[in-house]
């Protein structure tokens, strides 16, 4: 049975999943009980780990623990931000086909290459499984959030990641818009409100200004930086500590030691969090590098000084969004903080001062608000009839201007940034040479006057134009942006009716359909491998638990008296051999563990039966022990039932 549609906040550092059920949004906890899950994937000699398990082993396995996929998705390898990030990543990123970045790892002893979409799809698969475990049903439909300032390539790539994860991506929505739903869902009445969403997460930053009235959420303007967040503050703290270590230890530089750097980063991130509630934090690392310990104390003031430039840069998009919306700061009724990095006191102070002392709204959980809004939108799109969400309408905007190149490399804009979407605009163009039989349509996004300074999304040819003097042919170009913010372009020769159409699926950070199909197959294969590994671990635990239970019970004096020392000692010897075998065969197959369990059961179960028949069942009045499984004797084939203990 298929479950309801879910909302996933696919974050740079953490992800969150939610569902709308029984007129309420439920944030779904993972198997560790945490309501957010690290966006981490790790590859070891034996298995693939996702989420908490991946992050927890990061210091031991830095080269094969992948995070920050969101900072790679939809980008080119030679992108300035990718090159900058590579200095901080312990894993290897190389230049792949079409200039797409490839992530290289060693998995089960083999070199493997992944695209960012595949890593993100693994995180999405984990979030899907968390939801399925909670709902007890399979999940297919999803709304995934992206930063409002993500460009076309990044949106397409995120949609592809959902497809690879076996999900039907109903809609891609902007993170601040989703957060606005979380803020405004229960605030019916009270007239029109101008709300500014300040969303500073682990890796991205967005500002959106919305007008909210009676369930209508209309985005007026959006601005941001897809490469600013908590990770950047961590980097500055790490760089400070590396310099400090050099100063204290005669110039010893730990920068090239990935494991030391990763341990330091983990402690710096922890210190950053502590500094949100305390005025100082201590970093203590035993044997950080060449046996040298590193201990230091960071004050909140020092941290703020290190990050001052980055903190202040968050106000630039705020000013830009206000200017684009035509509002001044006094017209903003509420400033809503979203994203874990808004817990930093200095960020809160900067915003408060910018808005002339207005206290920011802290009524929504900054880690969960985006997933909350995504779940509401998922419920609406899947036809949920709840009265609470029936009247809700989202009107979002295109974050960047879209246009095409005309003579001289000029950017001719068809859709201006902050235009409400979905939208459709057309314009007539012509040829600039006599008897020109074809035109090259080049589609760009960006705010600069010349196309060379903007981002090329794609290009296509319209051929078969009837030969005519320059300026005579009429070519109608139509730009159509769908609700996901993804662009379709059509060019038509008005005289012949001949047209060409393209959804922007160029190789600028985009996967081909063949690549997506291959990745879907591989994702299925990895899922099967994970399942196989899980069954192996389960059967190993089953064998170990059975052996230890039997060992404890058979070691009791009363049992030896009832059954005879020889029989008991023989069984205990079999159990000891089995436990030694498990110790030496940690990577055995599921069937091998099962066979070994049957062998041990074959020796022990007759003794169990004999005990029950003699009326001296464990747990009875003359017995202090107890077999797992309670009062009835276990069936010969399966042995006692043991409860799994993690």
Curated annotation (Swiss-Prot):
Record keyword DNA repair present: no
Region of interest (Disordered), ranges: 613-646
Which Pfam families does the record cross-reference, listed alphabetically? HSP70
Keyword Cytoplasm in annotation = no
Query: Coiled-coil region(s) at which residues?
Result: none
GO terms (molecular function) for this protein are: ATP binding; ATP-dependent protein folding chaperone
Keyword annotations from UniProtKB, A to Z: ATP-binding, Nucleotide-binding, Stress response
What is stated as this protein's family in its record? Belongs to the heat shock protein 70 family.
- Its protein name is Heat shock 70 kDa protein
Q: What organism is recorded for this protein? A: Theileria annulata
């Amino acid at each position: 049975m298929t479950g309801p549609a879910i909302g996933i906040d696919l974050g740079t550092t953490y992800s969150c999943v939610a569902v709308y059920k029984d007129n309420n949004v439920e944030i779904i906890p993972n198997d560790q009980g945490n309501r957010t899950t690290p966006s981490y994937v790790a590859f070891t000699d034996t298995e693939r780990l996702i989420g908490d398990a991946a992050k927890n082993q990061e210091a031991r396995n830095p080269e094969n623990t992948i995070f920050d996929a969101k900072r790679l998705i939809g980008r080119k390898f030679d992108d300035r931000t990718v090159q900058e990030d590579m200095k901080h990543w312990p894993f290897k990123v190389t230049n792949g086909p079409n200039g797409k970045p490839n992530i290289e790892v060693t998995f089960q002893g083999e070199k493997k290459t992944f695209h960012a979409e595949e890593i993100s799809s693994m995180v999405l698969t984990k979030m899907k499984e968390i939801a399925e475990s909670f709902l007890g049903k399979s999940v297919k439909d999803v709304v995934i959030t992206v930063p409002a300032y993500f460009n076309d390539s990044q949106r397409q790539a995120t949609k592809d990641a959902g497809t690879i994860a076996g999900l039907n991506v109903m809609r891609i929505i902007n993170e601040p818009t989703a957060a606005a739903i979380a803020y405004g869902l229960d605030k019916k009445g009270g007239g029109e409100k101008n709300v500014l969403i300040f969303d500073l997460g682990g890796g991205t930053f967005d500002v959106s200004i919305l007008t909210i009235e009676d369930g209508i959420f209309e985005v007026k303007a959006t601005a941001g930086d897809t490469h600013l967040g908590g990770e950047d503050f961590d980097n500055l703290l790490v760089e400070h500590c590396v310099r400090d270590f050099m100063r204290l230890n005669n110039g010893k530089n730990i920068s090239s030691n990935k494991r030391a750097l990763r341990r330091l980063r983990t402690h710096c991130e922890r210190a950053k969090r502590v500094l949100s509630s305390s005025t100082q934090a201590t970093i203590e690392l035993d044997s950080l590098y060449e046996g040298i310990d590193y201990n230091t104390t960071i004050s909140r003031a020092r941290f703020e000084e290190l990050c001052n430039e980055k903190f202040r840069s968050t106000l630039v998009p705020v000013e830009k969004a206000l200017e684009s919306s035509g509002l001044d700061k006094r017209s903003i009724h509420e400033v809503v903080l979203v994203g874990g990095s808004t817990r930093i006191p200095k960020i809160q102070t900067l915003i408060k001062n910018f808005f002339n002392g207005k206290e920011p709204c802290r009524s929504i959980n900054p880690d969960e608000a985006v997933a909350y809004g995504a779940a509401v939108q998922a419920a609406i799109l899947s036809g949920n009839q709840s009265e609470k969400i029936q009247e809700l309408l989202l009107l979002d905007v295109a974050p960047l201007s879209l246009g095409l190149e005309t003579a001289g490399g000029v950017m001719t804009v068809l859709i201006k940034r902050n235009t409400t979407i979905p939208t459709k605009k057309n314009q007539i163009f012509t040829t600039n040479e006599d008897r020109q039989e074809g035109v090259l349509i080049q589609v760009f996004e960006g705010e600069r006057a010349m196309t060379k300074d903007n981002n090329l999304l794609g290009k296509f040819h319209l051929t078969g134009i009837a030969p005519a003097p320059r300026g005579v042919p009429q070519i109608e170009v139509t730009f159509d942006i769908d609700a996901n913010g993804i662009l379709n372009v059509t060019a038509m020769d008005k005289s012949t009716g001949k047209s060409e159409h393209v959804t922007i699926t160029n190789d600028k950070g985009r996967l081909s359909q063949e690549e997506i199909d291959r990745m879907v197959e591989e994702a299925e294969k990895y899922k099967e491998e994970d399942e196989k590994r899980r069954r192996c671990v389960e059967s190993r635990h089953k064998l170990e638990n059975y052996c230890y239970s039997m060992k404890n019970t058979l070691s009791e004096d009363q049992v030896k008296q009832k059954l005879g020392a020889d029989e008991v000692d023989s069984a205990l010897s079999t159990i000891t051999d089995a436990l030694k075998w498990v110790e030496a065969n940690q990577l055995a197959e599921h069937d091998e563990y099962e066979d070994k369990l049957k062998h041990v059961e074959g020796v022990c179960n007759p003794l169990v039966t004999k005990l029950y028949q003699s009326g001296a069942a464990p747990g009875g009045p003359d017995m202090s022990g107890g077999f797992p499984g309670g009062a009835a004797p276990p069936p010969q084939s399966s042995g006692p039932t043991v409860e799994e203990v993690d």
